[in-house]
Amino acid sequence: MQSLQELVSNMREHKGQWLHVVSGTVPVCKSGSKIHRLGELRLMSAQVYQIVDSFMNQGQKKKILLGEEVVTTVNVGENFQMRVHIYRQRGTLAFSGKLIPAKFATLMDLNFPEKLQRSFLKSNRGLILIAGSRDSGRTRTLNALLDAYAKQSSVHIVSLEDSIEGIFPRYDNSLISRRIYGFDVKDFESLEESLIKGDLNVLSVGEINNLDRLRLALNLSSRGILVIGTILGVDVEGVLMNLLKCFGGGLQFRMSVAEVLKGVYHRRTIQNLDGERYEIDESFVNYAPTRKHIRENHIQSIVSFMKTGGRSDCWDYSRSYQSLVDNGGLTVDEVPQKYR
């Protein structure tokens, strides 16, 4: 029987990032946009069950027996972990796994803009959103920010996560507590008061993918806590448009967002016609003029504010694309029409 470790070793030979195992098929890995078969042998449902059974705990096994999905993290070597999503298809088990470094990157490793780093790290309350599409490095950036806060100040950080990924180093003057949704955290109604009573300075809510997490983020940021979360979106404009529709999108809600939102950072990976990959970004930091735009739901006014470049920590993708064109990374024709 193939083990998860053997599958990971095979996928690393192809420089794969994603592993996909479906009962009755040959396992495959994905590297960039290419898919590679890992051998020729199909894995039957019993074999797939044995693989996932080898790394699940009893609680996770019960969820699978009840027909629920499971997300967990598995150590697959000294330097890597795999975030595994176990689900059912056609009545049998399947799973997808993403290979991630066990050691967290720093903001410097990620080339996080220094001008934005200064703006974010001087904040001690409010809401910061790290945005992007799937696989854009949102969680990696979030953890790098937490690491930076822990190094620069004496703070108590609580990180709420779907699964524990990576290992934070020890800090001389800071503490990071990590709690898992659905295991350590089950009741959102009591969670807010529990966190407030815990002498909390910084809270990571992980991915804001439901209204409970958004409500928690807004409530705690309004009570003097610095809250950081990740969110899906095509760009800053899209993130703000979707955010302001939540909870009915009324004036009272927009006023709350305008008051607590510190900024949105969005990053994406692009590829030119020669196959070369680049990471580009855009940033919005919420200043007094833009708070008014949020209250009035004037998103286009915020986009214009970013385009004008009146603030060094605010810029849009049109400037990032133009910088790539100027440096020879892209041709003008490769730039999406929206950003020309």
Where are these regions (language model features)?
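Short, flexible helix-loop junctions that flank or precede catalytic/ligand sites
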Residues: Q2-R340
